[in-house]
UniProtKB/Swiss-Prot annotation:
InterPro entries: Ribosomal_bS20, Ribosomal_bS20_sf. HAMAP family: Ribosomal_bS20 (MF_00500). The gene is rpsT. Signal peptide: none annotated. This is Small ribosomal subunit protein bS20.
Length: 100
């Protein structure tokens, strides 16, 4: 347990930041899942509207990841890996739809 006031305050700040980071990561994961769902719906019914929806979801997810890196929630390499894996997963889902 902290003995002086500054240490107690640092504990409070660390807990506040932990909760904010947790919330931000949760929102980021939600956007990534939404992106994969949009890719699945594009696979079922390929069309301009589904493609636009997919592109919008990808842009939102990438933006959220970039902001997480900028805020220090994620390390920049971790952010780059998340973007790369998300893009690869979306392409893997979309490839069969484009070959039709």
């Amino acid at each position: 347990m902290a003995n002086n006031n500054s240490a107690k305050k640092r504990i409070q700040i660390a807990e506040r930041n932990r909760l904010q980071n947790r919330s931000y990561k949760s929102a980021m994961r939600t956007l990534m899942k939404r992106c994969l769902t949009a890719a699945g719906s594009y696979l079922e019914k390929p069309g301009e509207e589904a493609k636009a929806n997919l592109q919008q979801n990808i842009n939102e997810a990438f933006s959220k990841i970039d902001k997480a890196v900028k805020k220090g929630v994620l390390h920049r390499n971790n952010g780059a890996n998340k973007k790369s894996r998300l893009n690869a997963a979306v392409k893997k889902l979309i490839e069969p739809a484009t070959k039709r």
